[in-house]
Design a protein with these regions (language model features):
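Structural motif
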Residues: 38-47
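A general structural signal for well-ordered alpha-helical segments in protein cores
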Residues: 15, 46, 71-72, 116, ...
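A short beta-strand-loop structural module common to alpha/beta enzyme folds
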Residues: 28-39
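Helix-adjacent hinge/juxtasegments
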Residues: 48-85
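Glycine-rich phosphate/diphosphate-binding loop of Rossmann-like nucleotide-binding domains
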Residues: 5-24
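C-terminal binding/interaction regions
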Residues: 4-6, 10, 89-148
Length: 148
């Protein structure tokens, strides 16, 4: 499976750990992140990931910044993207199962690299439950066409 990954200066070590895990499982990571701790702007690395997910180039996206908030906000500006800020594995599972999230946003300053790998593993292996959640997820996109 192809997965797109991007990170700012807070996440190079996290990205390396995640990419190593993905490769060990036979996945194809698409790297849009920085490899240094030199200060950069997270949207420059998040938008390419969101585009990959939005247009179907990647099945899932992984974005990493200090708090995870700015990355998630940037990604969620793209059509068909549902980026979820996750800080523990259980939240990653619920983001997939109940919200059909397709991008996981990881807060590097509030998690560890091993936790991030565990969250990614849980995120990409959890199916969307559909059912009552499908109706709710559909309403997320409805705002893009609705007149309020």
């Amino acid at each position: 499976m192809k997965l797109s990954i991007g990170n700012d200066h807070a996440g190079p070590d996290y990205k390396k750990a995640i990419v190593d895990y993905l490769l060990s499982q036979g996945h194809e990571p698409i790297n849009h992140g920085t490899d240094t701790a030199d200060s950069v702007d997270y949207p420059d690395f998040v938008h390419p990931v969101a585009k990959d997910v939005s247009n179907g180039t990647a099945a899932f996206g992984i974005i990493i910044c200090g708090s995870g908030n700015g990355a998630a906000m940037s990604a969620n500006k793209h059509p068909n993207v549902r980026a979820a800020l996750c800080w523990v594995k259980e939240i990653a599972v619920l983001a997939r199962a109940h919200n059909n999230a397709n991008i996981i946003s990881i807060p590097a300053r509030y998690t560890s690299a091993p936790q991030a790998v565990a969250m990614v593993r849980a995120f990409i292996s959890t199916p969307f439950e559909g059912g009552r959640h499908q109706r709710r997820v559909a309403k997320i996109s409805d705002c893009c066409t609705a007149q309020f």
